[in-house]
From Swiss-Prot:
Pathway the protein acts in: Purine metabolism; AMP biosynthesis via de novo pathway; AMP from IMP: step 1/2
Family stated for the protein in its record: Belongs to the adenylosuccinate synthetase family.
Pfam short name (any one): Adenylsucc_synt
Binding site for IMP: 12-15, 37-40, 129, 143, 220, 235, 299
Natural source organism: Arthroderma otae (strain ATCC MYA-4605 / CBS 113480)
Oligomeric and partner information: Homodimer.
UniProt keyword annotation of GTP-binding present: yes
PANTHER family: ADENYLOSUCCINATE SYNTHETASE
Listed name of the protein: Adenylosuccinate synthetase
Length: 422
């Protein structure tokens, strides 16, 4: 049976910990979309692991890991991340991670183009990670991309990469990029990659036929989805439920649970509308207390209050069957906590979440104010040990989402800092 873990906001919700917890029982852990632009951290046995393109199921010694067809893979980053895990003592990681032959290759060329495209947008910059993800997905959609399986044929790889480079030179003129150097690097990678490349359909079907436990690890989050996010300030892949099914070629009828990960407040990295953003001491307090710096970019995250309008929209699309509320402890020192319950535009309450980012920039927020608890929840592992007002905050969120249960509550960075209400 399949469990899918998805970010419900703009990413950085803390998906790594619940994925780590659930992967202990998983036999196959999959990444379905995105690339090394994603990032999350797992603390296991007092060792911190940063994951970007690799599935975090690698922390579990018996879990097989798959990077699916919906992803884009920067090969140097793949091997760099493997080396980092090796160096921290994880066993047999190189024997337990596979890449779909249908995944796309993200070249250094794409990162160069990413920077040029961002510079050309001026004040309307998307705020990308600069990793080349958008240009790589653009090449995929335009049917000129290079797949992981193409790497095994030297002639095919060279021809396609030279064609890409020539096209971008026609568009931009001079590029700070050497195609010969990238081709030479892939001559070294070819033999190293070969043991990792698989026919994804055969691998996934084998686990499905055995009724194995499969975990799909969503990257980024719903509000960064190319279709349903705050377009155009989004990533270039499908980051919701649909992308998880498509990117791993899952049988939808095998899905047992869809876990939405919800940060107890909101954050966002990069540009784009953020209705509940607090450009004041509240935002600064959340940023400092929450240590809100991006795992991939190191950029400060923008911070604001929890947004139930956004979460209801997210739940409508992803159909969560359970929630993991994270970083509850960051709210410990607030006298009162605000929650967005409605948007108004031109004085009228909106009935649905706006598709237009321009409209989102203009909305007026209707807040409900809840009492804080002014006592520590750090490290609490039992529901009954939470302060009463912290319990009420959790129950308020459940009620606002129509009764979707919050089954896990994060109360700190360590693996043990989790309340399991199952």
């Amino acid at each position: 049976m399949v469990t899918i873990v998805l970010g419900s906001q703009w990413g950085d919700e803390g998906k790594g910990k619940i994925t780590d917890l659930l992967s202990q029982k998983a036999e196959l852990c999959c990444r379905s979309a995105g690339g090394h632009n994603a990032g999350h951290t797992i603390v296991h046995d007092d060792i911190t692991y940063d994951f970007h393109i690799l599935p975090s199921g690698l922390v579990s010694p018996t879990c097989v890991n798959l990077i699916g067809a919906g992803t884009v893979v920067h090969v140097p980053s793949f091997f760099k991340e493997l080396a980092s895990l090796d160096g921290k003592g994880l066993k047999d990681v190189r024997d337990r991670v596979f890449i779909s032959d249908r995944a796309q290759v993200c070249f250094d060329l794409h990162a160069v183009v990413d920077g040029l495209e961002e510079a050309g947008l001026g004040t309307r910059k998307v705020g990308t990670t600069g990793k080349g993800i958008g240009p790589c997905y653009s090449d995929k959609a335009a049917r000129r991309g290079v797949r992981i399986g193409d790497i095994m044929d030297e002639g095919v790889l060279e021809s396609k990469l030279r064609s890409l480079e020539a096209g971008y030179r026609r568009r931009f003129g001079e590029l700070d990029y050497n195609v010969e150097e990238e081709i030479a690097r892939f001559k070294e990678y070819r033999s190293l990659l070969k043991p990792h490349i698989v026919d994804q359909l055969t691998l996934v079907k084998k686990f499905e036929d055995e009724s194995a436990s499969i975990l799909v690890e969503g990257a980024n989050a719903l509000m960064l989805d190319i279709d349903y996010g705050t377009y155009p300030f989004v990533t270039s892949s499908c980051t919701g439920l649909g992308g998880a099914v498509q990117g791993v070629c899952l049988n939808p009828t095998s899905i047992k649970s869809i876990v939405g990960v919800v940060k107890a407040y909101c954050t966002r990295v990069g540009s784009g509308p953020f209705p509940t953003e607090q450009l004041n001491e509240v935002g600064e307090k959340l940023q400092v207390a929450g240590r809100e710096f991006g795992v991939t970019t190191g950029r400060k995250r923008r911070c604001g209050w929890l947004d139930m309008v956004l979460l209801r929209y997210s739940a409508r699309i992803n159909h969560y069957t359970a929630l993991n509320l994270t970083k509850l402890d960051i709210l410990d020192d607030f006298d009162e906590i605000k929650v967005a319950v409605a948007y108004k535009l031109d004085g009228k309450e909106l009935e649905s979440f706006p598709a237009s980012s321009d409209a989102l920039e203009k909305v007026e927020i209707v807040y409900e104010t809840l009492p804080g608890w002014k006592s520590t929840t750090m490290g609490v592992s039992k529901w009954e040990d939470l302060p009463v007002n912290a319990q009420k905050y959790v129950e308020y969120i459940e009620h606002s989402l129509g009764g979707v249960p919050i089954k896990w509550i994060g109360t700190g960075p360590a693996r043990s800092h989790m309340i399991d209400r199952n």
